[in-house]
């Protein structure tokens, strides 16, 4: 991954983290890795554990960002979520939501819950 792409991803994740905090989420982990799988942000609010993918767009895109969640991405997120839950037993009884935070530099953030 190029430094420019990494920097852009970090910027998007920072914006998304601040957005989630504004919605009363507690950020537990950023860039959580399990085996070859990654979850951008893991947060908790009340009794729900949120596993969020972040997509950062510098310009306005005319498509629904939820289409970025193909079967391979879903499988990897589920595997990473299982790893996190195995390592953090205190969250075993929480509800789980797989989410997307779409960050547009000009339009702000949009949050998609319970994608799969």
UniProtKB/Swiss-Prot annotation:
A GO molecular-function descriptor: nucleic acid binding
Note the superkingdom of the native organism.
Bacteria
Family annotation (Gene3D superfamilies):
3.40.1350.10
UniProt xrefs under HAMAP family: UPF0102
PANTHER family under this entry? UPF0102 PROTEIN YRAN (PTHR34039:SF1)
The family note in this entry says: Belongs to the UPF0102 family.
Q: What is this protein called?
A: UPF0102 protein LIC_11564
**Which species is this record about?**
Leptospira interrogans serogroup Icterohaemorrhagiae serovar copenhageni (strain Fiocruz L1-130)
């Amino acid at each position: 991954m190029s430094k420019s792409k990494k920097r852009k991803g970090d910027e998007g994740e920072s914006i998304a983290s601040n957005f989630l905090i504004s919605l009363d989420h507690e950020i537990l982990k950023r860039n959580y890795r399990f085996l070859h799988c990654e979850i951008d942000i893991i947060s908790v609010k009340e009794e729900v554990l949120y596993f969020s993918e972040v997509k950062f767009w510098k310009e306005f895109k005319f498509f629904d960002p939820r289409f970025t969640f193909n079967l391979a991405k879903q499988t990897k997120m589920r595997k990473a979520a299982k790893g996190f839950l195995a390592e953090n037993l205190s969250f075993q009884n929480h509800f789980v939501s797989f989410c997307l935070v779409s960050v547009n530099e000009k339009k702000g953030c949009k949050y998609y819950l319970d994608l799969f």
